[in-house]
């Protein structure tokens, strides 16, 4: 064991192990402080990179333009309920890189201007910098597009002016928006990870930092917030071509005016179709890019007439002039409503439904009509009352038409064969008696008694005829009495 003095000498030596121990303690403290600093820095960085929760989207459009259906589709719901006044829903936003979620508020204003006062509940002076505006235009009715956009843009401008934002703050918002518009960079082809916006420059000449000046008609109506013009129901382009004889010239003219409007407000333009699910995913990605700064790599699309996409900052007057090269019957400066005319309203022709009239009412009308008509003699009424000049027609000689129809309860009397036999026997007796008379009167007599015989012949002829008539009457009454007795027996 070493002496105590020696141990003290070792510990207290000027260049001994004591100096090394103190150095180790200092290095450990520095490492601990650096560790805590890195942890705090990481926490603060994560806090700053967390998705904000106060972002909002404000949607304007006419009734029936499909704005609620569009936002409901972006939300992921199949069917949305149509509200009144000011509708609210939200979009779920997920950042895969940071594994973070948030909700983006969506406010949809009613198409009736009566409800524009409700904007104060959706946008305030504090929330305006965190707001994205969407103007919805109905492409199935292109004659209403420009008027609708101008109307809703003026409504938004009026509301912003009423909020009484300090001029310094408003100018700052406008300068920031101009810078974002000028800093647009089209993504490189085949580069999926390149951001749409130009990042901070680490090297390069001063010329790269100089922004290009704005054109004459660019950002003349700067609202200080991003604006997006969405044309819905673009699947109706084929219907316009068939039913309203729209040609490529009409579609280019519409697109030209839309792009000019977007240049004035620094807005993006996108054609969509919920029915065909066209450009819906593209619209969602562009919204979260403008709102949360997500990477966006889709360039401008102008080839398809019903799937146009023009991001904010890409367009200019020279690119729009390319559309004017195909104009033959219209000029670029012509008024929109002069060429895109509202078609006349076609009245639908329906088969008129005939209601059955009440029977009594119908009969009363016929009776009143007959009463108003003058009485005119008819052929049927003249026939029975013909004068002496007419043909002597008796009622008993009527044809089959004059025979009255017998009712089911009336029995038809059958002819009796005995009557025919009696008539035949009467004829035989009459001829027999006549032959006898002729023989008696025609017998030869004395010639001198010719005058007496003729006189006697006349008187005797009358007597015989009267006797014959009496005999015939008697014989006629006898068969009738026999028929009557036989019928009485049958009834009994």
Swiss-Prot record:
Omega-N-methylarginine carried by residues? 397
**Residue stretches of biased makeup (Basic and acidic residues):** 471-480
Gene Ontology terms: cellular component: centrosome; cytoplasm; cytoplasmic dynein complex; microtubule
Residues recorded with modification Phosphothreonine? 441
Primary location: cytoplasm
Phosphoserine is carried by which residues? 194, 383, 391, 443, 446
Q: Where is the signal peptide?
A: none
Residue spans of biased composition, Polar residues class = 371-381, 452-469, 482-492
* Similarity annotation: Belongs to the dynein light intermediate chain family.
Q: What's the protein called, per UniProt? A: Cytoplasmic dynein 1 light intermediate chain 2
Organism name: Macaca fascicularis (Crab-eating macaque)
